[in-house]
Regions:
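Active-site C-terminal subdomain of aminotransferase-like
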Residues: 2-3, 9-113
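Short, hydrophobic beta-strand segments
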Residues: 84-85, 130-133, 171-176
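Conserved PLP-binding catalytic core of the aspartate aminotransferase-like
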Residues: 119-152
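Conserved PLP cofactor-binding pocket of PLP-dependent enzymes
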Residues: 128, 154-172
Length: 199
């Protein structure tokens, strides 16, 4: 929602009761940092609030007790991580990070779909896409991909995660770390290309 060109992906979001996203997964905030938007905060308050006599605030109306919105009565100050990220990178820096990651992922997607022994499973959405290695001589393509993901991750140049699309074990690619640079896409491409040539 921070980049205008991707706001179309949020169409219909007004029908949702809540939205959660994790800035520690993509935006570079320190772990753990989640953001939770609620349409009606009273629903969560009614679910989670615990008000024994010793916690009641008498004679004061309209006080928001944040302990009413979480299971524990106290809260860590997680918002500070996000505040520091926004202060250090700025909204323009965060937008650039998102745009770069999406563009770099799309660039990699278009390169690897031309490789032999690669089957693209899903197109990139916000920089995330899936693919798998194929080999007509392999009896079990899922096992082949599981083995290749382990090899790639053990080498330590890039890190990929497997998932399932239907019954197919596929490989997820997502550009998404604060320190990532454009040449890291070249490293990922060479790594995937080398495996596709050996498959």
């Amino acid at each position: 929602i921070i980049c205008d060109e991707y706001k179309y992906l949020w169409q219909g979001i007004g029908k949702a009761d809540s939205i959660v996203f994790n800035p520690h997964k993509w935006l570079g905030a320190q772990f753990d940092c989640s953001v939770h938007f609620l349409k009606d905060m009273n629903v969560q308050k009614n679910t989670l609030s615990l008000t024994p006599e010793y916690l009641k605030t008498s004679g004061v109306e309209g006080i928001t007790n944040l302990s009413d919105y979480t299971i524990p009565l106290g809260r860590r100050f997680r918002a500070l991580k996000l505040w520091f990220l926004i202060r250090s990178e700025g909204l323009s820096g965060i937008r650039k990070l998102i745009r770069d990651h999406i563009n770099w992922s799309e660039e990699l997607f278009h390169k690897i779909k031309l490789l032999k022994n690669i089957e693209v499973i899903t197109e990139p959405v916000l920089g995330l896409f899936t693919f798998r290695f194929i080999n007509q001589n392999s009896e079990n393509i899922n096992e082949l991909n599981e083995k290749i993901v382990k090899e790639i991750n053990d080498e330590g140049l890039i890190y990929l995660t497997p998932t399932k699309v239907g019954e197919k074990l596929v490989i997820r690619f997502m550009a998404g770390t604060l320190e990532m640079e454009e040449n890291d896409i070249d490293v990922a491409y060479e790594c995937i290309k080398e495996k596709s040539e050996r498959t």
